[in-house]
């Protein structure tokens, strides 16, 4: 497994920032860092530390800089102490939250640190968070497209990013 290079990053406005590289990344506001295409079988692993209790972040798959639609696993705050993974269709032609596509609620880590492991096998994607949440869904086209780590609000630090692909 190796740390990927950042292929592109958001440059929306002065409040949305991407700082650092893939080994030590900081996303602020509504920002994203795009990474190269994935293989057919992948293991993505990283740690996210949020600055506040309500900061929101996620991972998008089947994404490119010009994608009209892509799919995101969003770690959404359901309250100050609870989180849930929402499955969303994002992009200029996306419809947002996909009903009945979310996870069970889990407790926000006391230290705001989320250890994330994502495995994909062709179109099956499974996301694990801190050994307390597991979410699986089918997403077509993972292996032909880029992916990103996103901040939707607040400030998130990403460390220890590795990707292993077959």
Give the location of each predicted region.
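Beta-rich accessory regions
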Residues: 1-166
